[in-house]
C-alpha cells in the first residue's frame, strides 16, 4: 500500500464528514484512511463507523481517550502504507494533495515532503501560507543550511514553527529508522516536537512551494483560537523536551531557537488568556529564568514588539488592559 492517512477524531461532529469527504476524493490510488476515535463522547464514533461501512478505504480505531499524541501514535502503529500523512479532522485536503506529494516523494526519494497551505477563517476568507525557502529537493547539506535555522522556531514570532505534520508527508521507513513518534504527555501542539525531530534527521526533504494543497480551518475552540487549562505548563514541558533533544547537538546550535520557541508560546498564552493573574504567572516564570537578561529581541510586527516590551518589563496590568481581561483559568 502506498499511503496511510491518519485522522485523529475527538469532538468534531460539525466537521468530520467534510474532512473525510475530501479524503475520499483524493486522486491517488492504493491508500487507506485511518480514523482514530480517541474516545470521543459525542456521535463521532458512530459517524466513523458509518463512513467506514461505505468504503474499503477507511479503517476505524476506537480507543480510550488519551489525547492527540496518543491518537496519532495509534494510527502510526496500525498504518500499512509506505508513506504517512496526517490530516486534522476539522480540516480539508485538496483533491490532488496526496497524489502530488506521493509523486514528489517517490521521484526524489525524500524522507519528508512539505506543501504550502491555506489558512481559512470562519468568515471563509483564506490566504496562502508560504515560506522563504526555494522549491524543490534539499539534501542534507542544504537542510542544515536552510532548514535548521528555523527548524524549531524562526525569528518572526508572528508566525509559528516551520513544519507541521498536517502539511507534510513522511516515509514510514524513515520514521521507523529513527523511532519517531509523538510524546503522549504533550496533549496539544505536540506536532511541533515531532516535526522538529523529523526535520533534524531528514536526509532528503522536498518542498512544494506555492501549492496550497491543505486547508487549515481556524475553528472555534481550537488551540489556535483558545488556551485549554494548564496550557502554559504544557508548553514549558514541551520546551524541556526540545531542550533535552537539541541542546547538545554538535552539528548545529539551536539555543536561540529554543528561546524563541518558549517566547512564542508565552505570547500565545498571554494573548489567549488575557487575565492579570495568569499573565503574572507566565512573566514570573520567564524572569525567574532570567530569560530577558541577554535576550536579543526578534524582528517582529509593531504590535508584537509592544507586547514583548511589556513582557520584558513585567507590565502585567498594562498587558491585561490592552488585551482585554477574560476569566482566569488554572495553570
Where is each model-derived feature located?
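Short, well-formed alpha-helical segments that are part of the catalytic scaffolds
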Residues: 11-25
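Membrane-interface aromatic/basic loop that binds lipid-linked glycans or pyrophosphate carriers
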Residues: 272-331
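Donor-binding/catalytic cores of nucleotide-activated saccharide
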Residues: 68, 92-209, 214-230
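Acidic helix N-cap motif at the loop->helix transition within catalytic regions
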Residues: 15-17, 42-51, 92, 96
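Cell-envelope/extracellular polymer assembly enzymes that use nucleotide-activated donors
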Residues: 1-4, 32, 193
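Glycine-rich, basic loop-to-helix element that forms the pyrophosphate-binding segment
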Residues: 63-79, 89-92
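Short aromatic/hydrophobic "clamp" motif used to bind/position activated sugar donors
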Residues: 84
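A conserved acidic beta->alpha catalytic loop
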Residues: 22, 29, 37-47, 64, ...
Amino acid at each position: 500500500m502506498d499511503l496511510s492517512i491518519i485522522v485523529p477524531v475527538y469532538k468534531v461532529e460539525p466537521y468530520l464528514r467534510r474532512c473525510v469527504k475530501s479524503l475520499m476524493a483524493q486522486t491517488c490510488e492504493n491508500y487507506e484512511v485511518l480514523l482514530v476515535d480517541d474516545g470521543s463522547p459525542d456521535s463521532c464514533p458512530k459517524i466513523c463507523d458509518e463512513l467506514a461501512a461505505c468504503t474499503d478505504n477507511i479503517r476505524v480505531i476506537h480507543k480510550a481517550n488519551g489525547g492527540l499524541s496518543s491518537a496519532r501514535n495509534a494510527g502510526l502503529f496500525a498504518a500499512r502504507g509506505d508513506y504517512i500523512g496526517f490530516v486534522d479532522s476539522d480540516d480539508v485536503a485538496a483533491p490532488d494533495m496526496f497524489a502530488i506529494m506521493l509523486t514528489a516523494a517517490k521521484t526524489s526519494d525524500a524522507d519528508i515532503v512539505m506543501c504550502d497551505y491555506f489558512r481559512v477563517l470562519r468568515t471563509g476568507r483564506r490566504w496562502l501560507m508560504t515560506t522563504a525557502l526555494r522549491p524543490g529537493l534539499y539534501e542534507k547539506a542544504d537542510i542544515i543550511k536552510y532548514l535548521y535555522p528555523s527548524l524549531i522556531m524562526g525569528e518572526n514570532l508572528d508566525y509559528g514553527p516551520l513544519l507541521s505534520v498536517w502539511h507534510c508527508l513522511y516515509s514510514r521507513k524513515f520514521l521507523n529508522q529513527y523511532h519517531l513518534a509523538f510524546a503522549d504527555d504533550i496533549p496539544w501542539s505536540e506536532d511541533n516536537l515531532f516535526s522538529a525531530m523529523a526535520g533534524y534527521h531528514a536526509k532528503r526533504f522536498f518542498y512544494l512551494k506555492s501549492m496550497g494543497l491543505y486547508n487549515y480551518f481556524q475553528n472555534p475552540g481550537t488551540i489556535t483560537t483558545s488556551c485549554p487549562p494548564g496550557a502554559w505548563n504544557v508548553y514549558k514541558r514541551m520546551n524541556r523536551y526540545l531542550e533535552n533533544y537539541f541542546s547538545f547537538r554538535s552539528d548545529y546550535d539551536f539555543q536561540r531557537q529554543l528561546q524563541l520557541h518558549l517566547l512564542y508560546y508565552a505570547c500565545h498564552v498571554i494573548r489567549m488568556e488575557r487575565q492579570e493573574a495568569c499573565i503574572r504567572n507566565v512573566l514570573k516564570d520567564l524572569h525567574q529564568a532570567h530569560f530577558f537578561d541577554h535576550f536579543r529581541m526578534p524582528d517582529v510586527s509593531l504590535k508584537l514588539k509592544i507586547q514583548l516590551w511589556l513582557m520584558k518589563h513585567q507590565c502585567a496590568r498594562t498587558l491585561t488592559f490592552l488585551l482585554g481581561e477574560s476569566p482566569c483559568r488554572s495553570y
